[in-house]
Amino acid sequence: ECDVLERFKVKHQWQTVFSEAHRTEFSLHFWKEFLHDHPSLVELFTRVNGANIYSPEFQAHGIRVLAGLDSVIGVLDEIPTLTVQLAHLKAQHTERGTKPEYFDLFGKHLASHLGDELGTHFDYAAFRDCYDFIASGIKP
């Protein structure tokens, strides 16, 4: 679904937690929790030293992943641009053999992390609707 109001809310809430000042800490906490809960996925990040989330290689990669999501969230209300961005990310993830279920795990953890950050200001339903819309456009 991800209607106009939900898109606005998601953009605003995402900007609150993923602003320039908070991006590194947000990324570190997110990936620490995500890989702790899914240790078998660490092997997906061997190329970027995923065994050490504090390494510069992994921190840069973690921020790149979230920055990719940031770029999509930023154009949620610009459908032609959004369509191109989703197609680009889908091609990248298809080429890398990313399994569709990884997007579901990622989204679940991201929602939990956003809820921790935003507390009672988090609109979980809006996030889920828009994340599901985004993920459906990227999943291989």
From Swiss-Prot:
It holds the Pfam family Globin. Heme b binds at residue 93. CDD domains: Mb-like. The giant hemoglobins of worms are formed of a monomeric subunit and a disulfide-bonded trimer. This subunit is monomeric. This is Extracellular globin-1. PANTHER family: GLOBIN-LIKE PROTEIN (PTHR47217:SF1). It comes from the Eukaryota. Residues 1-140 form the Globin domain. One of its GO terms (cellular component) is hemoglobin complex. Disulfide bonds join 2-130. Keywords: Disulfide bond, Heme, Iron, Metal-binding, Oxygen transport, Secreted, Transport. It is found in: Secreted. Belongs to the globin family. One of its GO terms (molecular function) is oxygen binding. The keyword Lipid biosynthesis does not apply. SUPFAM superfamilies: Globin-like.
